[in-house]
Structure formats: structure tokens, C-alpha cells
Design a protein with these regions (language model features):
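Hydrophobic alpha-helical transmembrane segments in multi-pass integral membrane proteins
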Residues: 146-156, 214-221, 270-285
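Small-residue-rich segments of transmembrane alpha-helices in multi-pass membrane proteins
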Residues: 18-21, 72-73, 135-152, 201-202, ...
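Membrane-embedded alpha-helical segments that form the functional core of polytopic membrane enzymes
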Residues: 18-60, 68, 97, 109-120, ...
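Transmembrane alpha-helical segments that form the membrane-embedded catalytic/substrate-channel core
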Residues: 46-54, 116-123, 165-183, 215, ...
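Interfacial loop-to-transmembrane junctions
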Residues: 243-273
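Intramembrane alpha-helical segments
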Residues: 81-152
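Cytosolic, membrane-interface loops and tails of multi-pass inner-membrane proteins
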Residues: 1, 58-79, 176-203
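Multi-pass membrane catalytic core of lipid/isoprenoid biosynthesis enzymes
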Residues: 68-109, 199-223
Length: 285
């Protein structure tokens, strides 16, 4: 049983779902229906877990080349590729059935798009072919925002898209920080992550570019959602703290990889704090 849970990458799923509940709260202009929230989060967990399980099947030959991923259940033989594929298919179908029966048609469609996009577009088409893989493939990680919003309203507003772009621009610096830390692993697998194929200077410029757009999108989100001005101030401060982490990432520093690891951890903290802020600001407005 543990092996099948590992296939779903529940720690990654948890991070994805951090943005789902805030999106539902913003869409509902308050607390969403409890049953709807539970159904959306559970179905979203299955959908993301399905995509992750398919990813492990497809990338098992690459995973065995990387120390960080060499203990995954398909690589070790704990679970066969065929069993993992069946599992991924079943929980994916179950997630869509749950979305259809307990949420809205649009949320169901978006969940399907998210699974297909992550598996086909990101994993199969982009990841091993371009250094911009995480930029475009990362769009799948933004889908929980749209799914959560659509589960409440069966529509998408500018506020939903603003939240989408916060996650979209957050994703590259988050994953590039991880790729810096595990650069040798990605190189061994032949995965052209930007830190593997580009200079440190180029990587820093790209991380700054996306961080600035992330901060701008977070301001847009607060304004579009018509949240209190105090929440805008806190949002800007969170963004500036994020940017401050990048200042410490210096091209010639012997601590380069260590600092990148700290940025990766802070990026998770940033997204979690922003999500809590959105919920609190909406409930108090």
C-alpha cells in the first residue's frame, strides 16, 4: 500500500492543493460548502496523484539514473510498470467521476486537462526536449486554482486567472532552485533543466524575471479580488522577502547550491503564507 501512495507523490500533491482551498474561498466570497470543498480536495488529490503515477511510469528509466529518485517504487521493482499504469488510470478515472458528480462540469474538464497536460505535454513532450520545460509544463501545477474556482462557480473570472499566473510565475524559480541543488542528478539523466544547460548568470536572470512577474501577479490578484489594502501590503512584503532570497544567490559563491536549497524551501513557505493570507483576508473583508 505504501508503494502506491509513493506513486502519487503526496507531498507534491499537498503543495498543489494549498492553492485549491483559497481559490474556492475567493470564488465563494467566503467559506464554500463543506461537502463541496471535501469532494474537490479529495478528487483533486486523486487527479494529481494519477498524473504523478503516470509520470513515474514514463520516467522510470530516467529516475534510476538520479540518486534523488532512484528509490521510487517503479524503479526498485516494488510495483511493476503495468500495475502502476493500472493504478494511475483507475484513480484518474475515479477523480473525474467524483468531480462530475460532486462539483461542476467545468471543474471536471479542467481536471482532465490538467492530467493530460502534465502527462503528455510536460512529461512526454517537453521535459527532455527544452530548458523551458518547467515554464510551460508548470502550467499543470496552476490548474488546482482554476479547478477550485470552477468547482464553486462553474466559470472562471479575472481573479481566478490572476491567481493562476501567481502560481505560473512562482513555479520556475521554485523548481530551478531545486534543479540547482540537484544539478548533477539532472545532468546524469540527460534532463535539460535550465541550471544544467545554461550559465549561472542566465539562470539568475530568468529567476529574477519570473519572481518580478510573480509579485506583480500577486498584486493583481489582491486588487482583482477586492481584498483589503492591508492584505496588499502583506502580499508585497512576502514578495520582497522572496526576492531577498534571490539576492543571496550569487553567481560565484561557494554556497550557491546551498542557498538555492534555501530558496526552494522558502518558495514553499511563500506559497503557503500567501494562501493563508488570501483566506483570512477574504473572510475578514
Amino acid at each position: 500500500m505504501r508503494g502506491y501512495l509513493d506513486l502519487m507523490k503526496l507531498r507534491v500533491v499537498e503543495l498543489l492543493l494549498v492553492s485549491t482551498l483559497p481559490a474556492m474561498v475567493l470564488a465563494a466570497k467566503g467559506l464554500p460548502d463543506f461537502g463541496l470543498a471535501i469532494a474537490t480536495i479529495f478528487a483533486g488529490t486523486l487527479a494529481a496523484g494519477s498524473a504523478n503515477a503516470f509520470n513515474m511510469v514514463i520516467e522510470s528509466d530516467l529516475d534510476k539514473l538520479m540518486a534523488r529518485t532512484s528509490k521510487r517504487p517503479v524503479v526498485t521493482g516494488q510495483i511493476s510498470k503495468s500495475h502502476a499504469t493500472i493504478f494511475a488510470t483507475l484513480i484518474g478515472l475515479l477523480s473525474l467521476i467524483l468531480f462530475w458528480n460532486f462539483t461542476t462540469p467545468l471543474a471536471t474538464l479542467l481536471a482532465l486537462v490538467a492530467i493530460v497536460f502534465y502527462v503528455v505535454v510536460y512529461t512526454m513532450a517537453l521535459k527532455q526536449r527544452t530548458a523551458q520545460n518547467i515554464v510551460w509544463g508548470g502550467a499543470a501545477g496552476c490548474m488546482p486554482v482554476l479547478i477550485g474556482w470552477a468547482a464553486v462557480t462553474n466559470s472562471l473570472s479575472l481573479t481566478a486567472w490572476a491567481f493562476f499566473f501567481v502560481i505560473f510565475f512562482w513555479t520556475p524559480p521554485h523548481f530551478w532552485a531545486l534543479a540547482i541543488k540537484y544539478k548533477d542528478d539532472y545532468a546524469a539523466a540527460g534532463t535539460p533543466m535550465l541550471p544544467v544547460v545554461a550559465t549561472k548568470g542566465r539562470v539568475l536572470k530568468e529567476m529574477w524575471f519570473h519572481t518580478i512577474l510573480m509579485i506583480a501577479s500577486s498584486v493583481w490578484l489582491i486588487l482583482a479580488a477586492d481584498l483589503p489594502m492591508w492584505s496588499l501590503a502583506i502580499t508585497v512584503v512576502l514578495g520582497l522577502v522572496f526576492a531577498r532570497q534571490l539576492v543571496a544567490l550569487k553567481e560565484g559563491s561557494p554556497e550557491y547550491a546551498k542557498v538555492a536549497g534555501k530558496i526552494f524551501q522558502w518558495s514553499i513557505t511563500y506559497l503557503s503564507l500567501l494562501s493563508v493570507l488570501l483566506v483570512v483576508a477574504q473572510l475578514l473583508s
